[in-house]
UniProtKB/Swiss-Prot annotation:
HAMAP family: AcetylCoA_CT_alpha (MF_00823). Residues 33-294 form the CoA carboxyltransferase C-terminal domain. Component of the acetyl coenzyme A carboxylase (ACC) complex. First, biotin carboxylase catalyzes the carboxylation of biotin on its carrier protein (BCCP) and then the CO(2) group is transferred by the carboxyltransferase to acetyl-CoA to form malonyl-CoA. The gene is accA. This is Acetyl-coenzyme A carboxylase carboxyl transferase subunit alpha. Belongs to the AccA family. It comes from the Bacteria. Pfam families: ACCA. Acetyl-CoA carboxylase is a heterohexamer composed of biotin carboxyl carrier protein (AccB), biotin carboxylase (AccC) and two subunits each of ACCase subunit alpha (AccA) and ACCase subunit beta (AccD). It is found in: Cytoplasm. One of its GO terms (molecular function) is acetyl-CoA carboxylase activity. GO terms for biological process: fatty acid biosynthetic process; malonyl-CoA biosynthetic process. Pathway: Lipid metabolism; malonyl-CoA biosynthesis; malonyl-CoA from acetyl-CoA: step 1/1. Its EC number is 2.1.3.15.
Length: 317
């Protein structure tokens, strides 16, 4: 398995390099019996990974949330849902590829999926606008929300954005208005809404598809009003202080759960979601199914009342 290691994972990377060298050696020379040594190093690597990941700080978790191999929305859609039919365009200006959405089935049940989509290679990153939606992306999302509401389909959103696109053209086309409209409309949808932060939850760019009955975060995701770098630049005029900002802002799942800003934390495989796509998709699917089962018990009136109470409770610990 080819892994991309972060700076704080370098000791793990060194061990994995030794393991790979021994494995290649044993494959070249079948007379060598070094399985014991390989297994010993694998055990050391696993133990070291557990030790490092049991004591991560907020900045390290931020790096995991941004990991280049971390699963994106389309990865989860492919592995959790069936019969996904993507819907495009806002019917007003254009189609923003940083927001993806459409109708799919979850265990044969029709649902509406919305998510931010980043890219991995340079061309794909540009195509997806680095996961930063424009107003037409949010208006496309709103169009899909209203379709879901009309046909009584639960809405499931997957949040992963550094923030809404800050370019002047986005402002000219009504970025603030598009985000605000989504916040208002999501609060009034008469269907169950389940939102999950799968990577970065950046400010209003995340909130525009993040108002729901259940708000979940993956174990190594982040959710904040501004990026640590942005906060550091404003407070200290120095982006090098981003690690301090990350710690002070309380952007990680455990802290946000303590503040009652999220409902559940979805556990990730050892080393992060990118280490085992099967485990993380299974965990996410199980969480969504549990949430849907719970929300299905409520009448439309109760669903809306509970959502209103949730929104009004924010800011009170």
């Amino acid at each position: 398995m080819n892994l991309t290691f972060l700076d704080f994972e370098q000791p793990i990377a060194d061990l994995e390099s030794k393991i790979n060298s021994l494995v290649e050696l044993s494959q070249r020379d079948k007379t060598l019996n070094i399985n014991k040594e390989i297994n010993c190093l694998r055990k050391k690597s696993e133990d070291l990974t557990k030790k490092i990941f049991s004591n991560l700080n907020a900045w390290q978790i931020t790096k995991i949330a941004r990991h280049p191999m971390r699963p994106y929305a389309l990865d989860y859609i492919k592995n959790i849902f069936t019969d996904f039919d993507e819907l495009s365009g806002d019917r007003l200006y254009g189609d923003d590829k940083s927001i993806i959405g459409g109708i799919a089935r979850l265990n044969s049940r029709p649902v509406m999926i919305l998510g931010h989509q980043k890219g991995r290679e340079t061309k794909e990153k540009i195509f997806r606008n680095f996961g930063m939606p424009t107003p037409e992306g949010y208006r496309k999302a709103l169009r899909l929300m209203k379709i879901a509401d009309r046909f009584n389909m639960p809405l499931i959103t997957l949040i992963d954005t550094p923030g809404a696109y800050p370019g002047i053209e986005a402002e000219e086309r009504g970025q603030a208005s598009a985000i605000a409209t989504n916040l208002r409309e999501m609060s009034m949808l008469k269907i169950p809404i389940i939102c999950t932060v799968i990577g970065e939850g950046g400010s209003g760019g995340a909130l525009a598809i993040g108002v729901g009955d259940k708000i979940n975060m993956m174990q190594y995701s982040i959710y904040s009003v501004i990026s640590p770098e942005g906060c550091a630049a404003i407070l200290w005029k120095n982006v090098d202080k981003a690690p301090i900002a990350a710690e002070e802002m309380g952007i990680i799942a455990t802290r946000l759960k303590e503040l009652n800003l999220i409902d559940n934390i979805i556990p990730e495989p050892l080393g992060g979601a990118h280490r085992n796509i099967k485990i993380i998709t299974s965990n996410l699917k199980n969480r969504i199914l549990k949430d849907l089962k719970e929300l299905d018990k409520f009448t439309t009136s109760d669903l809306l009342n509970n959502r209103y109470k949730k929104l009004m409770s924010y800011g009170y610990n």
